[in-house]
């Protein structure tokens, strides 16, 4: 039954991607200054929005774990964060490719890019930290505390272009057909995120079931 | 009457392994409970939960009806664990006044000096702990644990590896404490010393409470009796 | 008020213990002076004024790490941490006491480093002295709070030595960047302008948020 939902969502995502790619590649015109390259924005921007959304959820569930002690919040925290890190990497890579083509540089140390890189390092650190603790309860507790600290960087990434002058472009107004494409692609990515989270959650639940059975076996 | 120390259906897991299972235990005020068991039976784990260092995986513990982590409760509990819990870089006197301050002891300098006298360390009050012999460190640890006049004492294998002088000091201090109606829970392998002090006995075997009751005459005359009767085969 | 009394008791205890053993503080001073000397040797004088802010805070961060990493780990021998957790001492008081002690030790290292910098780089750095001192305190507090907190977070981990640097530096980066920018500007003798005030507000905000978070979470992290 759980599998069915994943397959349905998967099919929906596939359809959406086909539709979106068609629109992005064929329907939309070349942008005035950037030519064809700007089309990567339709993946770059929603990837970061998705990652930000996922990390906010992870921050909240980490707080909920510390408040209630229920292991399901820990399972959600790790699943959501892992998927978020994947989207962070997509966001970084697409951004760097765009920058190389448009500005001629792979990287610059402006506020947005620096805080974004810190974000990747922090949540990567979260995953490494989890790997380093064997006891499930300690792991949940320590990583939840770390997740909350890491989350402080997320608003910094978001507001960095408002607070400082950055190389990274400022928010701009877009013609409606571009907004539409952007939002449709975001929908596809959100559904993809949900699929990955569900799969990871299921894996985490199975792991806990196995742990529970092992405990039972030891207790007998 | 509120139990001095109580455990209600306590479970504790280390990873997969259940270190404690279904522990239901109540210790009356003024009694002395000897907690027995082989190594790995769960004695230290249970004491750590009573002391508030760990939280039970399932179930709860209470000290005088309140949570073990409560600040007021912590003020009334004295702990003597495996480590001596005093600072090597500080002097004996500095260590005791430090803990005196943390526990809010009135007139902590005098109390510290009195305790140094009692454990026979007055003459080295300004010596740094790192210079002390093992026996001296252990006696300082005893002073630290009892300094704030606790009503509940949790002692994890307190007689292990003590020299004769330290054992004598500890026995005197514990008897005085019992005379003042303190409650003591101590885990031990030293059955003879334990049986002399204990009013009640509990035996842990593989995380379960195998026996809990008053100390009987048989236990006093043959300390190994309990293990033979209720321990693992 | 018992809270503050206990906080200062812990701070005094840490300072006394550190000043007697001098393990971390000696390493910290030596590291700081060595790096400053080496960089003075390696780079042309004119270039070093430009990089002064960055250089000084890299030195402070790494010299500081030598002190901060030991913060809670120093309680492990003799099981002293257990005694502190068992005492009627709020974990936040324990944390704050240690953070204050660390702050004082680090400020001592900085107080020596700045004049050394002035001498070996032939730099005039006292133009905006009081503002610079304020930035030094704010920046140092920021990364002290983080270092002390993460020392608590990792104290019971098997892989503490490996994990701590890995986790701590990314979190410190925003604070260090702000301090670097501000220090570089102030060493040049210029008062803070609007652009720099953004960094100043950022630094203050960083300090407030992480101090609050650390005080809130330290109890959860120490009791297993």
Give the residues covered by each predicted segment.
Chain B
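Catalytic Walker B motif of ABC-type/P-loop ATPase nucleotide-binding domains
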Residues: 153-157
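Conserved ABC ATPase "signature" region
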Residues: 97, 101-124
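Helix-to-loop junction immediately C-terminal to a conserved catalytic motif
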Residues: 51
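Conserved ABC transporter NBD signature motif
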Residues: 59-73, 211-213
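Helix N-cap at the start of a conserved alpha-helix in ABC-type nucleotide-binding domains
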Residues: 164-166
């Amino acid at each position: 039954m759980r599998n069915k939902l994943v397959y349905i969502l998967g099919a929906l995502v596939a359809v959406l991607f086909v539709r979106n790619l068609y629109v992005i590649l064929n329907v939309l015109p070349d942008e005035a200054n950037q030519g064809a390259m700007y089309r990567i924005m339709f993946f770059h921007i929603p990837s970061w929005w998705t990652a930000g959304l996922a990390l906010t959820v992870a921050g909240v569930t980490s707080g909920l774990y510390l408040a209630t002690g229920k292991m399901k919040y820990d399972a959600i925290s790790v699943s959501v964060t892992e998927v978020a890190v994947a989207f962070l990497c997509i966001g970084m890579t697409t951004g760097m490719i765009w920058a190389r083509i448009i500005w001629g540089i792979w990287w610059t140390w402006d506020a947005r890019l620096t805080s974004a890189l810190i974000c990747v390092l922090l949540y990567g650190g979260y995953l490494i930290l989890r790997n380093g603790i064997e006891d499930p309860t300690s792991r949940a507790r320590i990583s939840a505390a770390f997740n909350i600290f890491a989350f402080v960087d997320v608003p910094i990434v978001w507001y960095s272009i408002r607070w400082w002058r950055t190389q990274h472009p400022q928010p701009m107004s877009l013609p409606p057909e571009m907004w539409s494409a952007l939002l449709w692609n975001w929908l596809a990515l959100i559904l993809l995120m949900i699929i990955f989270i569900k799969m990871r959650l299921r894996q985490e639940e199975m792991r806990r079931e196995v742990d529970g059975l092992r405990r039972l076996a030891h207790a007998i | 009457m509120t139990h001095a120390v109580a455990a209600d259906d306590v479970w504790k897991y280390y990873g997969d392994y259940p270190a404690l299972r279904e522990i239901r235990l109540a210790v009356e005020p003024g009694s002395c409970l000897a907690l027995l068991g082989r190594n790995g039976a769960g004695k230290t784990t249970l004491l750590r939960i009573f002391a508030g260092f760990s939280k039970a995986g399932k179930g709860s513990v209470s000290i005088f009806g309140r949570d073990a982590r409560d600040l007021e409760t912590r003020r009334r509990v004295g702990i003597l664990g495996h480590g001596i819990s005093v600072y090597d870089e500080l002097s004996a006197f500095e260590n005791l006044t430090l803990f005196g301050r943390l526990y809010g002891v009135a007139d902590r300098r005098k109390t510290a000096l009195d305790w140094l006298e009692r454990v026979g360390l007055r003459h080295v009050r300004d010596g740094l702990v790192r210079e002390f012999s093992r026996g001296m460190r252990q006696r300082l640890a005893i002073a630290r644990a009892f300094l704030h006049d606790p009503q509940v004492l949790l002692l994890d294998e307190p007689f292990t590896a003590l020299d004769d002088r330290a054992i004598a000091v500890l026995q005197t201090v514990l008897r005085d404490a019992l005379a003042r109606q303190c409650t003591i829970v101590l885990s031990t392998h030293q059955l003879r010393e334990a049986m002399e002090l204990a009013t009640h006995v509990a035996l842990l075997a593989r995380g379960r409470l195998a026996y809990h009751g008053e100390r009987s005459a048989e236990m006093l005359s043959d300390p190994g009796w309990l293990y033979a009767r209720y321990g693992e085969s | 008020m018992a809270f503050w009394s206990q906080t200062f008791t812990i701070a005094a205890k840490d300072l006394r213990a550190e000043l007697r053993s001098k393990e971390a503080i000696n390493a910290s001073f030596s590291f700081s002076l060595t790096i400053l000397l080496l960089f003075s040797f390696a780079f042309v004088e004119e270039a070093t004024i430009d990089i002064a802010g960055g250089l000084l805070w890299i030195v402070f961060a790494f010299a500081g790490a030598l002190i901060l990493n030991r913060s809670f780990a120093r309680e492990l021998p003799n099981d002293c941490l257990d005694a502190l957790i068992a005492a009627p001492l709020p974990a936040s008081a324990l944390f704050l006491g240690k953070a204050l002690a660390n702050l004082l030790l680090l400020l001592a290292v900085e107080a020596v480093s700045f004049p050394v910098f002035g001498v070996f780089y032939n730099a005039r750095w006292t133009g905006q002295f009081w503002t610079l001192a304020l930035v030094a305190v704010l920046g140092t507090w920021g990364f002290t709070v983080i270092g002390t907190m993460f020392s608590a977070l990792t104290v019971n981990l098997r892989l503490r030595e490996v994990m701590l640097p890995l986790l701590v530096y990314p979190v410190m980066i925003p604070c260090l960047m702000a301090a670097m920018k501000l220090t570089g500007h102030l060493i040049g003798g210029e008062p803070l302008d609007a652009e720099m005030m953004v960094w100043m507000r950022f630094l203050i905000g960083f300090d407030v948020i992480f101090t609050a978070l650390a005080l809130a979470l330290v109890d959860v992290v120490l009791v297993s």
